[in-house]
């Protein structure tokens, strides 16, 4: 009886945590972004691990680095996905945002062609955030549906 319970517990844990590199899933829900280096490191780890990415809400600013780091075929979007893009910036001595052209170009060059074209059609990366969602986003990335693996993250 104890052995049967342990097997059931292990099976449930395996299903919920997505054990196995090819089965694990990272779910992005409401990510406002942050420092570029932090996100490059995070998503490089996801790329190397073989994990899949579900974008199921806001992914803004540095969060969008996922698009240029994780292979396209391992990213999917739900109907709630919303990507926000803007120029990269650094704070000045007073804490004001100063656009960083080099970092902006680096970010831009990481994005897939379809995303770069969409950004270009809206005037490029500027201090103003532009959002990609709905049909336009769905035309660029495959749709995904939540399952128990995604809900556990």
What does each model-found stretch correspond to?
Residues 1-9:
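Bacterial N-terminal signal peptides that target proteins for export
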Residues 9-17:
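Bacterial N-terminal signal peptides
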Residues 16-19, 153:
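Intrinsically disordered, low-complexity linkers and terminal tails enriched in Pro/Gly
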Residues 19-25:
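Sec/Tat signal peptide C-region and signal peptidase I cleavage site
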Residues 25-81, 87-91:
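Cleft-lining beta-strand/loop regions that shape enzyme active-site pockets
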Residues 27, 37, 41-54, 93-153:
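Charged, glycine-interspersed solvent-exposed loop segments at helix/strand-loop junctions
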């Amino acid at each position: 009886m104890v052995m049967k319970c342990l097997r059931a517990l292990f099976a449930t844990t395996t299903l919920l945590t997505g054990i196995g590199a090819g089965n694990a899933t990272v779910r992005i829900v409401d990510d406002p972004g942050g420092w570029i280096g932090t996100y490059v490191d995070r998503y490089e780890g996801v790329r190397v691990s073989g994990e899949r990415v579900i974008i199921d809400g806001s992914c803004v600013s540095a969060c969008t680095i996922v698009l240029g780091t994780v292979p396209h075929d391992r990213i999917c979007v739900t109907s709630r996905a919303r990507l926000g893009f803007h120029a990269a910036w650094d704070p000045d001595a007073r804490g004001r945002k100063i656009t960083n052209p080099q970092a902006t170009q680096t970010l831009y060059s990481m994005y897939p062609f379809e995303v770069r074209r969409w950004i270009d059609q809206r005037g490029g990366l500027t201090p103003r955030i532009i959002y990609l969602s709905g049909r336009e986003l769905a035309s660029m990335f495959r749709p995904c549906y939540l399952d128990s693996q995604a809900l556990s993250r």
